[in-house]
Amino acid sequence: MFSTDIIYEVVIFSVGDTKAGTKMGKLQLKNPQDGSLLNCVLWEEALNRMDNKLFRCGNLLRIVSGSFNEKFNNCLVSALELVKEAKMGLNETERELYYKELTSYFDKIQNEKLRGFLKEYFEKYKDKIKTAPAAKLMHHNYIGGLLVHTTECLKFAEINMDAMDYKPNRDNIYAACALHDIGKIFEYTIDLETGLIDYDESFRHEWLTHSQYGFSICMTQGFKEVAKMIAAHHGRAEWGAIIDLNERDLEPELYLIHLIDNMSAKFGKINASMLEG
């Protein structure tokens, strides 16, 4: 059920086609009072009356008019009220600062070929890197989210390498942190006016996943150890890993990158509201 008195938070929104050829919106809302989720449907006529900015992840909304369908366990929404607009992500100044901090780690890399490749690649795609989200839903799903996530990974890596008795190849760890999600600059699209995120279907047809892309560019450049870390960073095959960490005799570095990535995805600035204050 739903209530017109509850202020809901937008979790995710997407638009698809019905069998009749019309548009249908799918909106998932969270009740901040108990954390429960409400799945909503909006027909094309309702979508045409609403501003896309309404559906930005993190927005606080009130359902003005709707009906609950018990059979499908969803709410057919015909009118919404924006209560509070969420921050879309990093502003331009913040993006520049994060980009500068991220790329400063490249100067800590001793391997000239690897350092040169990273600097050249990031310079070539800097505009995409500065705005790309790190996900559509799971974590850092906002403008500049990939920048924040990648910078967090580099920070966590440095702290952990300084504290560990085991001494990994720092060059490769920094590079794997910088590149493990780099394919996301092509995998996702983000509307800078509304903050809405979607998949780029052309990328998914060509590359399947961002992990495959990152693995491939590193292998092409001869950075096999970095490629292997990227292949394993999701941890399990069912989570999208090319190399499953359940396999035997894997290098410790593979586990390190996975754990660092997971730390940022769980404990970093995972949503735009955390950027405020």
Predicted feature locations:
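OB-fold (S1/OB) nucleic-acid-binding surfaces
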Residues: 18-44
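Metal-centered catalytic cores of metalloenzymes
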Residues: 64-66, 143
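OB-fold/S1-family single-stranded nucleic acid-binding modules
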Residues: 67-93
